[in-house]
């Protein structure tokens, strides 16, 4: 397959202009028809207010065709296959000559045309299992992104997985979360962290990754999301996102598919113990978080998809002697700007409709700490994402339209064992300490503060131009009392640095 990179057009171009650009890049004759699909689309705003769309497209076929009118009245002049009816395409395939990739490359003389392989991810278990024994059914703990995809792949292989999720189904979970955001009591088993779809369901559904993908896993994930309800544009848009509102539909559809294939998804069911005999798993102990009843299920294979915040499960696994390794992380706060401000910085008043802009900023302090933006939510909301009593954590989310008044992003600082101490779970205890500080500073609500007051180490008394867009109760507090001197000084230094990239950022 051929891929044509760096096709650059004004952002408000027509489909016909893209067709023509592909035709020109390949140097096709007027009687040659090319079939292509968009592989990637990104925005080039380096020359704002002139904004460009930059494409990579995959060429599937190029044919020589008679210069006759098609049934729709158009001419055979290199337009993509979508312009040709299925019956007419079949006629062309049978009657006309396909042009080889080598000939196209040779005559195009275009360094942006390369040969690529269409890599498709293959699940290791390809043989459909029949009549699998009950004790051989794999058990999946957690129904966030990892658990959902594990269960789906296992179900498609005929292995009839059993999924235990400590939180609620998405419909019940949304009700529980809304009650909490409106001032109700936190449900420590079903909240923004726990429940069907995992934490990502209440975090916009950003699908960014910087890892290499030699086996095609990333596109397999994107294809799967589209199959269950996501917009097809996530297959090619740079920095794709789904939106919290659409994710709720997708996770339900995936669950129903798993059940339809013979799997089970059991909610309100927390892993409390794992029994191991001679180095082999023999049972899982599951507690119903609503009734308190406990079951012991015999099993041989367990997939732990427990996410970031199941801290009680981490400790249970450590007590049972499972090998664990600490992972570096970063901590910080959420920063809100008017989305119009971020848009203007990105597009400088471009005269056509553009997506809500995002940003990415990084900085290294004089002391060597890294400070950077993370999980940026255009047109989004800050949400109370707490999962333990007496602690406060926040996250960011956007709906599919990304049409909220404010943009928000985490501004976070790298931390090391010098900050939180040695021990495989020392970082977990450090997180808990910070969340307790936040809870105390906000008197049980989310503490908020103007950046100017944060710099001066004082509590704000009113809002300026930016009014918070927050899901959950909030009150004025001082973030210096939450993160401590070292981390706050790093953020303050970085904010001044960010202002050089985005004027007015701080």
Language-model segment annotations:
Residues 2-50, 59-69, 73, 77-506:
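Residues forming the flavin
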Residues 54-56:
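N-terminal membrane-anchoring/stem segments of glycan-assembly enzymes
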């Amino acid at each position: 397959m051929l891929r044509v990179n760096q096709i650059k057009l004004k952002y408000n171009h027509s489909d016909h202009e893209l067709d023509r650009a592909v035709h020109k890049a390949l140097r096709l004759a007027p009687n040659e028809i090319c079939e292509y699909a968009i592989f990637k689309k990104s925005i080039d705003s380096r020359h704002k207010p002139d904004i460009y769309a930059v494409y990579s497209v995959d060429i599937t076929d190029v044919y020589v065709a008679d210069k006759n009118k098609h049934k729709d009245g158009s001419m055979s002049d290199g337009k993509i296959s979508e312009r040709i009816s299925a019956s007419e395409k079949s006629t062309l395939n049978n009657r006309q000559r396909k042009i080889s990739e080598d000939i196209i490359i040779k005559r195009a003389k275009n360094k942006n045309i390369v040969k690529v392989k269409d890599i498709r991810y293959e699940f290791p278990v390809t043989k459909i299992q029949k009549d699998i024994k009950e004790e051989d059914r794999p058990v999946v703990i957690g129904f966030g992104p990892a658990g959902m995809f594990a269960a789906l792949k296992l179900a498609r292989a005929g292995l009839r997985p059993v999924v235990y999720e400590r939180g609620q189904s998405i419909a019940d979970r949304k009700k529980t979360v809304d009650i909490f955001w409106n001032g109700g009591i936190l449900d420590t088993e079903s909240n923004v962290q726990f429940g069907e779809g995992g934490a990502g369901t209440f975090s916009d559904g950003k699908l960014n990754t910087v890892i290499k993908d030699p086996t095609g896993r990333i596109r397999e994930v994107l294809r799967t999301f589209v199959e269950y309800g996501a917009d097809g544009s996530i297959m090619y848009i740079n920095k794709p996102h789904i939106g919290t509102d659409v994710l709720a539909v997708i996770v339900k559809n995936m669950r129903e598919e798993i059940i339809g294939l013979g799997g089970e998804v059991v909610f309100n069911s927390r892993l409390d113990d794992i029994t191991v005999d001679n180095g082999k798993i023999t049972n899982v102990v599951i507690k119903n978080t609503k009734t308190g009843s406990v079951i012991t299920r015999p099993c041989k294979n367990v997939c732990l998809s427990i996410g970031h915040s199941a801290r009680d499960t981490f400790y249970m696994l450590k007590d049972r002697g499972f090998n664990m390794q600490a992972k570096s992380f970063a901590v910080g706060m959420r920063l809100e700007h008017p989305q119009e401000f971020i848009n203007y910085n990105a597009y400088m008043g471009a005269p056509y409709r553009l997506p809500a802009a995002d940003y990415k900023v990084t900085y290294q302090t004089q002391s060597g700490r890294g400070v950077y933006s993370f999980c940026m939510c255009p047109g989004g909301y800050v949400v109370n994402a707490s999962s333990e009593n007496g602690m406060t954590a926040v996250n960011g989310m956007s709906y599919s339209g990304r049409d909220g008044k404010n943009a928000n992003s985490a501004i976070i600082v790298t931390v090391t064992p010098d900050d939180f101490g040695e021990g495989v779970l020392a970082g977990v205890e450090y997180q808990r300490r910070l969340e307790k500080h936040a809870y105390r500073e906000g008197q049980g609500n989310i503490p908020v503060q103007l950046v100017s007051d944060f710099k001066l180490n004082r509590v704000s008394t009113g809002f300026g131009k930016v009014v918070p867009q927050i899901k959950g109760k909030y009150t004025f507090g001082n973030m210096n009392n939450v993160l401590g001197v070292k981390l706050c000084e790093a953020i303050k230094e970085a904010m001044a640095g960010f202002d050089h990239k985005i004027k007015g950022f701080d």
